[in-house]
Regions:
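A conserved regulatory-domain signal marking ACT and ACT-like small-molecule sensing domains
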Residues: 48-139
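Short, flexible micro-motifs
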Residues: 25, 37, 70
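Conserved glycine-bearing catalytic or ligand-binding loops at nucleotide- and phosphate-handling centers
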Residues: 16, 20, 26, 42
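Helix N-cap and loop-to-helix transition residues
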Residues: 6-8, 37, 108
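Bateman/CBS regulatory modules and CBS-like beta-alpha motifs in cytosolic regions of diverse proteins
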Residues: 1-14, 25-27, 32-33, 52-53, ...
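Conserved mixed alpha/beta catalytic, RNA-binding, or beta-rich assembly cores of soluble enzyme
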Residues: 42-43, 84
Length: 139
């Protein structure tokens, strides 16, 4: 089993579905030009989510409508937070909703209660993880 260049997310999906932990990467001529492993995919995931920057991650369930993520982002910015990453998912949510995961930093922890209160008016809070303080809250 090999994967082509450029590597696509569907390639990672095939590797996962078949429980393959690594595979050669081949060019258009079929020549092996490298390898891809689960560790490589984990590194990409870590880079995309911004977890290396620590900070705070909040998960929401919000209406799937234009502007719903912007509303959350505006609230965070208004409280002095800066966003590292925003991820969304439609897995395990009712029709018309989506999950939104926002990782942020630069927020004064003393302002966190007011931020959570305002965010809760805009979307359903699912959980909060403060990686610096090693604290988790599930709602």
């Amino acid at each position: 089993v090999g994967v082509g260049q450029p590597l696509e997310i569907t390639d990672a999906e095939v590797l996962l579905a078949n429980k393959i932990s690594g595979a050669p990467v081949v060019d258009a001529a079929g020549k092996v030009v490298g390898t891809i492993t689960q560790s490589d995919i984990f590194r990409v995931l870590i880079a995309l989510t911004g977890i290396g920057d620590r900070g705070i991650q909040i998960a929401f369930m919000t209406q799937d409508r234009p502007g719903s993520i912007k509303d959350l982002a505006d609230i965070i910015r208004n409280h002095g937070g800066r966003m590292v990453s925003i991820l969304t998912s439609y897995d395990n949510v009712p029709e018309g909703f989506r999950k939104v995961y926002i990782r942020m930093y630069g927020l004064d922890r003393a302002k966190l209660p007011a931020l959570k209160e305002e965010l809760a008016k805009a979307a359903k809070l699912l959980y909060l993880v403060d990686h610096r303080e090693n604290r988790r809250e599930i709602y």
